[in-house]
């Protein structure tokens, strides 16, 4: 699937999404650029049909944390002379598996085998009569598992729940930070993120208020020792020199519609958005952050957000990452008009 592009990708996204993300959305690896899971799932299902000719009833995604939740119910999984438990399987599939398998195809087969063994245990009754509930409930509520149905009536019900991952409700969340690996490497498991969203004072003569977003990223990747296929810089020209363990993160800042950009800095150096547009009823600005191994960088965005006095309570969405994200919302006083 990775080798093919979806020919008619524009049919599955909005015109705003097409303009913001472009034909990157046609590639499987980039079908998660939007934080709106139904958008991503429609693209994935369409690509699978293009490749195989078969339609699917739905799309289910899990990450390493969901796998750990499941293994907590199934019990340990034996793989490649290792005993993987709920305590170590997340680190294994995001880091250690690359040491066991230098060949990326063999690595992919190993990870798929782990997932298959886990689901086979669940189907076999591991965890007792409520095993599936115990395995699925935690990731469904933490964002580690997402579900989409091709049947519109079923999808309508799913999209109203947390597991649906829909951004149709503009009141929840009001803002979001989306990280995308712009280098095309395997270093996400070494990236930690902390986000602070703060509301400031209300404007006296206009229906706006000050607002700020602070995003700090740390790259904890080692400077040596990782397999070459973990550390490439596919964003750079062929033959370009770069530090092993370095990466580039694309930061998409989603804020309430009508917000006006004021200024931004990366490590206190002024920057402007690389791109801007709209996605699921929110204003979006993109910033690119270069990170050397064992380094950090801070993006600070100042903007004006609409404040007419009837806005929803501010909330912030961040995606599930291998390293837990620290997210803080500082709510300002309600503006009176």
Kindly label every feature range from the protein language model.
Residues 328-330:
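Flexible helix-coil linker/hinge segments at domain or subdomain boundaries
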């Amino acid at each position: 699937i990775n080798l093919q592009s979806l020919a008619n990708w524009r049919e599955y996204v909005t015109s705003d999404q097409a303009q913001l993300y472009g034909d990157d959305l046609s590639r499987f690896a980039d079908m998660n650029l939007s934080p709106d899971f139904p958008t991503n799932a429609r693209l994935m299902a369409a690509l699978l049909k293009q490749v195989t000719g078969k339609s699917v009833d739905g799309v289910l995604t899990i990450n390493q944390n969901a796998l750990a939740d499941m293994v907590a119910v199934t019990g340990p999984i034996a793989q490649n002379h290792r005993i993987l438990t709920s305590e170590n399987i997340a680190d294994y599939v995001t880091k250690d598996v690359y040491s066991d398998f230098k060949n990326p195809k063999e690595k992919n087969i190993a990870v798929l085998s782990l997932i298959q063994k886990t689901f086979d245990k669940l189907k076999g009754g591991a965890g007792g009569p409520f095993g599936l509930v115990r395995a699925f409930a935690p990731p469904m509520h933490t964002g580690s598992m997402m579900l989409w149905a091709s049947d519109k009536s079923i999808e309508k019900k799913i999209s109203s729940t947390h597991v649906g991952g829909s951004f149709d409700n503009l009141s929840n969340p009001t803002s979001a930070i989306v990280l995308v690996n712009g280098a095309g490497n395997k270093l996400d498991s070494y990236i930690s993120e902390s986000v602070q969203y703060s509301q400031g004072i209300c404007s006296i003569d206009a229906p706006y208020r000050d607002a700020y977003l602070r995003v700090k990223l740390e790259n904890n990747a080692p400077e040596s020792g990782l397999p070459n296929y973990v550390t490439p810089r596919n964003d750079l020209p062929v033959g370009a020199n770069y530090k092993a363990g370095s990466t580039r993160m694309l930061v998409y800042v989603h804020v309430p519609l009508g917000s006006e950009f004021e200024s931004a800095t990366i490590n206190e150096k002024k920057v402007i958005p690389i791109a801007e547009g709209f996605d699921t009823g929110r204003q979006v600005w993109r910033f690119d952050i270069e990170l050397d191994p064992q380094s950090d960088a801070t993006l600070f965005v100042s903007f004006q957000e609409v404040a007419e006095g009837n806005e929803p309570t501010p909330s912030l969405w961040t995606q599930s990452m291998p390293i837990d994200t620290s997210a803080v919302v500082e709510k300002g006083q309600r503006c009176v008009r």
